[in-house]
Amino acid sequence: HTFGIDGVTTNPRHIMVSGKPFLTVISEMADWVKAEGIEGYEKFPISVEINPHLDDADEMVAEARKISAICSNFVIKIPCTEAGIQAARRLEAEGIRTNVTLVFSPAQAILPAKNNSLFVSPFIGWKEANGEDCKAYIQAISDIYDNYGYKGKTQIICAAIRTPKQIVD
């Protein structure tokens, strides 16, 4: 892929700032992957976040189904909340891939892996801003995945990256 990029993720706030309607933006993304011939999340995953104001698993699942029907590249980004974990479990059982985000501790990263989520997105910029060791945080999640057989099943995508050093580490 261009520049070695293996996938992308969306952010509702950034889409809102673009001034374009949400469905327009993700439809343009779907058109782009078709034009590039990289259809399918296996080739080029695009994490698309559901409405961040939803707090009901049924509503999350309903919105996720609509979004995933637009493009086979879309992986549904869901918050690591009680309702979000319930929704992710149901979606994965239906074959709709998920990326569980807003993960702030290694313990939170366990349930997405148990539910077979494709990705988990632990926030690191926030952790470092609060004086925590990001490298140790991600290593702890990786160690948990190694210990419980989740490594390779649920991939870790660091989120809220604020500095180049966080990428290198």
Model-inferred region functions:
Residues 1-5, 10-94, 124:
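Active-site beta->alpha loop and helix N-cap motifs at the rims of alpha/beta catalytic domains
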Residues 1-2, 62-63, 87, 105-115, ...:
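Catalytic cores of alpha/beta
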Residues 47-56, 72-81, 97-110, 121-131, ...:
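Catalytic beta/alpha-barrel core
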Residues 82, 132-148:
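Short loop-to-alpha-helix "cap/lid" segments that border enzyme active sites
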Residues 7, 12-15, 102, 118-131, ...:
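Glycine-rich phosphate-binding active-site loops on the catalytic face of alpha/beta enzymes
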Residues 17-20, 108-114, 129-136:
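Short, charged, surface-exposed secondary-structure boundary motifs
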Residues 145-169:
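C-terminal alpha-helical cap/extension of soluble enzyme domains
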